[in-house]
Amino acid sequence: MNDVKLTVLGGEGTGKSALIVRFLTKRFIGEYASNFESIYNKHLCLEGKQLNLEIYDPCSQPQKAKFSLTSELHWADGFVIVYDISDRSSFAFAKALIYRIREPQTSHCKRPVESAVLLVGNKQDLCHVREVGWEEGHKLALDNRCQFCELSAAEQSLEVEMMFIRIIRDILTNFKLKEKRRYSGSKSMAKLINNVFGKRRKSV
């Protein structure tokens, strides 16, 4: 059974916890600010594989708070970044989160494969008071090699489920790519060792 670790991030009041609960239970819980971090578990079958999905929901943070994401970057295989389409400040916070996730690829937290990231514009049911355009979200995702979608945790149970399946598929694709690179690296090392020691054997 494959373990898939997913972290859901976003500013306070964006509905990230509501998205998780909607996916796990099909119910909409409304919005609340949690002072506790939670890890949810779900077993599912996807692409013929049995998966143990762990979803990490950190405690709500004010959007102006400083954040490092160091532990999340080391733990998670992928990220869902949530903003509220009716709150421009939440979009700015989502942008900062994406920049932070992408930045480590060239520093201390370098990975063989870039983390899967899905940017989600939540509360599509509030489009009459929209402050962030669809095009803005799409461009931010495109510029930072992320997937993108808009939806409503309050009204769209199926869309929420498909959103999570989408990021999980991206993570599984990354697993295959890592394994392929690991196998290719092992073959290259074996060939190098054979070349070095093979030549020595011939010269003896």
UniProtKB/Swiss-Prot annotation:
GTP binds at residues 10-17, 57-63, 122-125. InterPro entries: P-loop_NTPase, Ras-related_GTPase, Small_GTPase. Its EC number is 3.6.5.2. The keyword Hydrolase applies. GO terms for molecular function: G protein activity; GTP binding. It catalyses: GTP + H2O = GDP + phosphate + H(+). It holds the Pfam family Ras. Residues 1-204 are annotated as: Small GTPase-like. Belongs to the small GTPase superfamily. Ras family. This is Ras-related and estrogen-regulated growth inhibitor-like protein. It comes from Bos taurus (Bovine).
